[in-house]
């Protein structure tokens, strides 16, 4: 039995989630809420500058999209409470707008009839469970929560990495820097922004700014609260980012032992270890949350460790959104099966 999902928002993440979800046999994309006509949405799904041509053909139809024999209803309403989720029997509303990341706002999808909500960004408050695959997904609780957050792309990268290091060697403290590709939050040319550095042209400079990844990490790895802090450098590339993590460990280790810990972590599909001397473009459309750059692992004084982890901040993250949606759907199905028996 497949899970009925609706996607609110057709920006970068919304479109990538749609591409991935359409090829997941456990998910049924029923509806999309977006402000653009079907022709525009279909074109931007079929053709993508960063990730290339889609291997399925998405065609515009009246008030919707069609992929083979599958039809997707297209609606356009900026108030989620007005959306036809009850009528369409939506199990999970995936909100990819970034506008409803507070639980008090996201609950509008529940009021509209969706059983659960999944946010494609870190929660800004309210009764929301933050879930990161490979970190705390075993604690996903559909009884206690109706709204879930898939955190950020950076938290999805650093989370599994920090968990492995902490479990194997113990983290005393550390600092992280994410070297992050351009996002829609930046300006192509100088224009006002509440962050004056992000007000500057994203194509011309390396831009130091903040990241919420270390703060969000405490939501999924509470044992590391107060132990990690960090910042971001926005760089003029279109996609693929990395986390540069430096930590002091409780145990003395070698670089080989650190890399082996990631190899043996058992996080298939989440962490990958790369031994080739690659560059950012080589990780474009890589579905993993974190790709350890084994050649860059360093150890100093026995317990000070530097780890570089690459991540496709669009495609890798969107894969995790779909994974979490699939997990929520499976739990809903199991609950309904038990209730019916």
UniProtKB/Swiss-Prot annotation:
The keyword Oxidoreductase applies. CDD domains: GAPDH_I_C, GAPDH_I_N. It comes from the Bacteria. NAD(+) binds at residues 12-13, 78, 120, 184, 313. The record marks 180 as: Activates thiol group during catalysis. Keywords: Cytoplasm, Glycolysis, NAD, Nucleotide-binding, Oxidoreductase. Its EC number is 1.2.1.12. Its main location: cytoplasm. One of its GO terms (cellular component) is cytoplasm. It is found in: Cytoplasm. One of its GO terms (molecular function) is NAD binding. It holds the Pfam family Gp_dh_N. The active site is at residue 153. D-glyceraldehyde 3-phosphate binds at residues 152-154, 183, 198, 211-212, 234. Catalyzes the oxidative phosphorylation of glyceraldehyde 3-phosphate (G3P) to 1,3-bisphosphoglycerate (BPG) using the cofactor NAD. The first reaction step involves the formation of a hemiacetal intermediate between G3P and a cysteine residue, and this hemiacetal intermediate is then oxidized to a thioester, with concomitant reduction of NAD to NADH. The reduced NADH is then exchanged with the second NAD, and the thioester is attacked by a nucleophilic inorganic phosphate to produce BPG. Homotetramer. PANTHER family: GLYCERALDEHYDE-3-PHOSPHATE DEHYDROGENASE 2. This is Glyceraldehyde-3-phosphate dehydrogenase 2. The gene is gapA2.
